[in-house]
Amino acid sequence: MIRLFASDMDGTLLNDKGYISDRTINAVKKLQKHGIHFIVNTGRDYRAAKRELDAASLSCDMICHSGACTYDVHGNGFHISSLPKSIAKQILTVFERHGAFADIATEYGKTSITDKNTLLSYYKNEVFPAVEQEGKVYFRTWHDFAMMVSKVRFFEGKESLLGCKTPIYKISTTFFDQDKINALKDDIHGIDQLHAVSTSKNDLEITHVNAQKGTALLRYAQTKKITPSQILAVGDSGNDLSMLSLDLGVTAAMANASATVKDVCSVIAPSNDQDGVAFLIEDILEQNELAARVRRSFCLALDYSKI
């Protein structure tokens, strides 16, 4: 029986318009009402992930930064696996060599070692064109984008960030030019103690080797006394592979997932635009109800046998 449902966010829980559908919202609430744990396992930072849950009036625990930090429903962080500053320095040096913008996640949330104008230029020239090319939505409104920018913590250069005590959870970047991102990937793989994955052809996410969605999910399940066989995990992209390749009760790929993701999963769900997450939840609840009926019938049969 499934006791923990773990869902990726972009391309999975969210549809291509960037929000959680009414059917999926109702399914998640019903799942939680039946006592089954629901957790979001995302590459987003806490604020960006919570923004979407708040818009849907949903609340749950979250694994953010692709496994680097887990948050309870109140926003308290635990199970933290940050990048050592020495490793972060190597990564940032490689980024500089390739002219890559360093999109950094720390305990402050989104963090930058450049100025605001450079950040805005990065989104205009790299992120937005890449997201548009994929047909996805990351910010539903300009207000959402403006709010994100207003929350960014700016440092004066990498030495300023590396010299403070704040932990670095993740360093990522996006290039609209795929040749540039591929060259960066080749260079990054020469650094030890890191885990580098992509959610699309245009991006790169880097965390500590112990900060992976799969590792974080198993750690979280242990705190709830839930075994791997009682977990359903669903996702669509490369940063989901560490959890979808685990020996879990069910591993599901969305219909819109990459071929690599589909190859490691036991189930293919409908796409994120066809309420794939809701479909999986409804199936779980239906199976649980059927199992409950069988148990009731069995108990009733035993009672009659004693007459």
Over which residues does each language-model region extend?
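Short, acidic loop-to-helix structural element flanking the phosphoryl-transfer center
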Residues: 18-34, 81-87, 153-157, 180, ...
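Active-site phosphate-binding/coordination module
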Residues: 22-136
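Residue-level signal for inorganic ion chemistry
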Residues: 31, 42, 66, 171, ...
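Short active-site oxyanion
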Residues: 35-39, 59-60, 170, 229-230, ...
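Residue-level detector of anion-binding/catalytic polar loops
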Residues: 37, 101, 195, 250, ...
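Conserved acidic, metal-coordinating active-site core of Asp-based
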Residues: 98-100, 108-231
